[in-house]
């Protein structure tokens, strides 16, 4: 079994290449071509070329058609997402600005920290995750009593964040959200692929309304961690498997294999 990194919005995502005496099987895991690690996905395609079986995710075709345009809140790639977030911050001078993000997207938050015009402050837990994953220390606030082993010189008092309107760009996680009624009126919040993810989640509309009720502008800026429909076909064609097995999709039948056969597996089926 060969483990290979691929481009995804979760740090450390990998595909697998499984070689047996009888066949060569590639498993994509979750992957894409529009993130920070496009070359890794292309390398996975190269290594998996002409495999006997390709098991590939099909998340995007669950919800989108091949000719669908990007949603207004969706960016072409991660770099555009960072630029869009920074522009929101720059255009809201003297306003409190908070955000939340997908905790596994280490590379995104690192680039936000590096480029944002304000000092970025994370929750203690998220700061701990980044430190453990890649050894980078960040500014943080803490609302629980756990010992994460963080640098106390980087700790920002939560009351200071609640009163801030120009210095900080800080994470509003689930614990901090309990204090939403203490946030500044007329402030700004940026939701970047954090939970709840969207309208399909029954918690999403009440979540958005909570900000509206507290006079905080709600912004969505997102960039999917999954290959878009046409990119999925590009990946399949680059690999050119003898047998394609779509998985991780509500509509696996939307994928097709121009160079071989396709199998739509059923629950409990042994291939």
PLM features: residue spans?
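Non-globular, low-confidence helical/coil segments that flank catalytic cores
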Residues: 2, 27, 35, 128, ...
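Conserved beta-strand termini and adjacent loop/short-helix elements that scaffold enzyme active sites
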Residues: 4-6, 123, 141-143, 221, ...
């Amino acid at each position: 079994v060969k483990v290979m990194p691929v481009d995804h919005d979760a740090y450390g995502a990998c595909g697998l290449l499984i070689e047996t005496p009888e066949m060569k099987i590639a498993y994509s895991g979750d992957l894409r071509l529009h993130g920070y690690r496009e070359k890794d996905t292309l390398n996975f395609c190269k290594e998996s070329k002409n495999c006997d079986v390709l098991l590939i995710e099909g998340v995007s075709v669950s919800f989108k058609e091949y000719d669908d345009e990007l949603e207004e809140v969706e960016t072409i790639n991660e770099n555009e997402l960072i630029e869009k977030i920074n522009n929101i911050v720059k255009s809201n001078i003297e306003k409190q600005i908070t955000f939340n993000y997908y905790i596994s997207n280490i590379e995104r938050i690192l680039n936000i920290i590096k480029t944002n015009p304000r000092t970025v402050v994370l929750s203690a837990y998220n700061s701990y995750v980044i430190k453990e994953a890649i050894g980078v220390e960040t500014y943080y606030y803490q609302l629980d009593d756990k010992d994460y082993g963080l640098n106390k010189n980087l700790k920002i008092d939560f009351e200071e964040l609640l009163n801030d309107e120009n210095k900080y760009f800080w994470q509003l996680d689930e614990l901090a959200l309990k204090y939403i009624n203490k946030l500044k009126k007329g402030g700004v919040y940026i939701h970047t692929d954090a939970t709840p993810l969207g309208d399909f989640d029954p918690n999403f509309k009440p979540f958005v309304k909570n900000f509206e009720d507290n006079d905080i502008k709600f912004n969505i800026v997102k960039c999917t961690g999954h290959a878009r429909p046409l990119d999925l076909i590009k990946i399949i064609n680059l690999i050119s498997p003898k047998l394609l097995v779509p998985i991780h999709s509500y509509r696996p039948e939307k994928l097709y294999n121009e160079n071989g056969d396709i199998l739509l597996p059923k629950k409990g089926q042994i291939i």
